[in-house]
Amino acid sequence: MMGYANTGQIASGIHFRLRARAFIVAEPKGNRVVFVNLDACMASQIVKIKVIERLKERYGDLYTEKNVAISGIHTHAGPGGYLQYVVYIVTSFGFVHQSFDVIVDGIEKCIIQAHENLRPGSIFVNKGELLDAGVNRSPSAYLNNPAAERRKYRYNVDKEMTLLKFVDDDWGPVGSFNWFPTHGTSMSRTNSLISGDNKGAAARFMEDWFEQKGSERMDSVVFEDEGLPRRISNIIPRRHDKRMLLMLCFWMKLLASFSTQI
């Protein structure tokens, strides 16, 4: 597995299925960009190269290395062996084609799905403070920072969530991406189940809620949602039973209170 640099951490089953989720933002007859959020520890150069090769076979030069971005949610409970650098595949005892192939397949399929569902719409952005969802994993080390530096911040961790909301002109909201800094380590180093960890679970809860809400007004919609932990730092998930519910409720609040359109 990929996550704790532990050769003894060998997958024995699946906690829940991993997903690749994509949005394409395009101008009519103009520029476009693809953003893929992958339920994996990280993306890899060799994965992107292979994905671009497949997209070029299907779409020509429409999608290239310049307008396709692939990002991982940083789960520490995902499959290993799909990166091209030795240091990252030592604990999986080398390159694992099974991991690599299924990741490439999933990314390719989600981009094709997004391409085939391009529709006119708008993008909104919002920010808010989410409390009690994570803690500093080394508060004592944080205190070694100069006092003047620490006084600039209210907390010893970043508690700001940024959320992009995608709205179809006809259907209304169809999905979101968000950035919130917490580490994907709720599943410990003794875990042997493939999992999207806290960000993957939060995304699935969000999708279930979104699909149930959306089914009231449409028969068939593809929803793409995901928590995107790019500001990871030293923040670890806070351990309490209602943390996922807290995060989901906060997402709902953000989705309902957009004030800025881009």
Predicted feature locations:
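Conserved beta-alpha junction segments in alpha/beta enzyme cores
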Residues: 1-262
